């Protein structure tokens, strides 16, 4: 979030129009009046926007190339914040799936954030433009056949695309955040809807970055790097509570790989999502163990073809619950070393249109499990998704005349991984995933996936 200037009292007074004796009042504001309105608008944003100390980020601590010989700090002081991220996932399945194989799938992301206070004297604002390209071969699609992608970069098909093209404005000391433009409901940096920092400790897309079933049940929900036109508002009247809601263009064709993120059409149907959240023990003065609880719902407008008939039904909808809780602290508290638990639940109850009506995920994450490795992360998680009974009935009927069609029951992923901070800005996360009922098909052999998730922040 962009920091604003210290609070200032506005010295602006209402505009006065001088009249020449015998003349009529000016029909409009005039140039001077319009300029004064612009001044008043800027003053309003200055008084309402977030106010905080302007601290220089620790570039040496967070990026492989550090401060770029001082150029990064210079850019930041001028309101320009570039971000570069590279993710590579060399993974293979020595057992199970359609067949055995090894692939590397990767994603490169470039983002530019512009601080409007430093550039335009408008506190609390941020322009964001982003680009991403995925390349390589997706292990889950090519060799295993599971729905929960193994590789963390397997969030989009191969190809380049424009990602974010948005503006965010913070108002009222950061209590209100407004965002509009080309958006997704999750975020590469920070958090949007249905998020938990614990999800990012996992490699499998079943967990990371938000529960997979939200996207699977609602094709109008866009997740990074796919974006669509939308607007989001978040209001946090106190530190412990917030509410947020967003409305987006839910046309799934906008996110197709061959549109490259530049399909700016607005054909709908609308996709809406809303969430309320509670934060526990997260003030600087709190001594208890922190936790989060989030409850939300989503709906895709329009009509949807029902699985078990030629008729159409209403839009898809669902509810979700996300929570995490620190269980124990260890070591130096300033290092934020702790053991925590997370959980998520997604219910899309209309089985006539929702392919995975029930999903849950849970796990344990240890941040800094070893005294000598305070930045390493040990994680174990389980994700389960149950397929629609209506869809299963349809496929069982179709299988009688078309044997290759396979009815789906459930799919489950169990992951164990250990993230190693090699140097600042470069992590290696070796991991193992057990994949049960890949694609929800019991006849597909369960698989074991082994590999490494490599992440470089430049």
Segments (PLM) and residue ranges:
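N-terminal periplasmic/intermembrane-space "pro-region" immediately following the signal or transit peptide
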Residues: 2, 41-89, 93, 117-121
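Long, well-ordered mid-to-C-terminal structural blocks that present hydrophobic/aromatic surfaces
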Residues: 281-373
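Transmembrane beta-strand segments of Gram-negative outer membrane beta-barrel proteins
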Residues: 57-58, 72-95, 127-129, 137, ...
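Outer membrane beta-barrel
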Residues: 101-217, 221-252, 353-361, 366-394
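Outer-membrane beta-barrel "beta-signal"
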Residues: 446-458
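Transmembrane beta-barrel strands of outer-membrane/channel proteins
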Residues: 82-90, 127-133, 178-182, 243-249, ...
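Short loop/turn motifs that connect adjacent beta-strands in outer-membrane beta-barrel proteins
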Residues: 66-82, 115-127, 172-175, 240, ...
């Amino acid at each position: 979030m962009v920091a604003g200037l210290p609070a200032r009292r506005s010295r602006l007074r209402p505009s006065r129009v001088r009249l020449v004796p015998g003349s009529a009042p000016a029909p409009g504001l005039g140039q001077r009046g319009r300029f004064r309105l612009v001044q008043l608008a800027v003053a309003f944003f200055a008084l309402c926007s977030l106010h905080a100390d302007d601290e220089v980020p620790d570039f040496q601590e967070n990026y492989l190339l550090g401060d770029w010989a001082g150029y990064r700090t210079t850019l930041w002081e001028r309101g320009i914040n570039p971000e570069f991220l590279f993710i590579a996932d060399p993974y293979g399945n020595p057992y199970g799936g359609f067949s055995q194989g090894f692939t590397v799938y990767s994603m490169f992301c470039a983002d530019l954030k512009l601080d409007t206070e430093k550039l335009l004297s408008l506190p609390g604002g941020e322009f964001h433009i982003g680009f991403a390209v995925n390349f390589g071969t997706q292990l889950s699609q090519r060799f295993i056949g599971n729905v929960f992608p193994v590789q963390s970069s397997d969030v989009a098909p191969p190809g380049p695309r424009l990602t974010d093209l948005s503006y965010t404005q913070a108002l009222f000391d950061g209590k209100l955040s407004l965002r509009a433009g080309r958006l997704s409901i999750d975020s590469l940096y920070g958090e949007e809807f249905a998020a938990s920092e614990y999800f990012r400790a996992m490699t499998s897309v079943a967990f990371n970055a938000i529960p997979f079933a939200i996207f699977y049940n609602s094709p109008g929900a866009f997740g990074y790097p796919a974006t669509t036109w939308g607007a989001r508002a978040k209001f946090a009247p106190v530190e412990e509570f917030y509410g947020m809601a967003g409305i987006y263009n839910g046309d799934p064709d906008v996110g197709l790989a061959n549109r490259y993120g530049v399909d700016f059409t607005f054909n709908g149907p609308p996709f809406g999502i809303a969430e309320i959240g509670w934060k526990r023990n997260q003030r600087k003065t709190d001594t208890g163990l922190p936790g989060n609880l989030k409850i939300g719902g989503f709906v895709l407008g329009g009509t949807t073809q029902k699985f078990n008939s030629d008729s159409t039904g209403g839009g898809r909808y669902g509810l979700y619950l996300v929570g995490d809780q620190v269980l124990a602290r260890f070591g130096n508290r300033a290092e934020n070393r702790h053991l925590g638990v997370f959980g998520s639940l997604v219910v899309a109850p209309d089985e006539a249109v929702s392919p995975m009506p029930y999903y849950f995920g849970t796990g344990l994450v240890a941040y800094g499990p070893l005294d000598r490795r305070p930045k390493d992360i040990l994680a174990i998680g389980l994700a389960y998704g149950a397929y629609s009974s209506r869809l299963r009935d349809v496929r069982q009927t179709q299988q009688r005349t078309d044997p290759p069609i396979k009815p789906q029951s459930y799919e489950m992923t169990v992951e164990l991984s250990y993230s190693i901070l090699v140097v600042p800005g470069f992590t290696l996360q070796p991991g193992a995933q057990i994949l049960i009922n890949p694609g929800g098909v019991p006849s597909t052999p369960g698989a074991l996936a082994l590999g490494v998730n490599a992440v470089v922040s430049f």
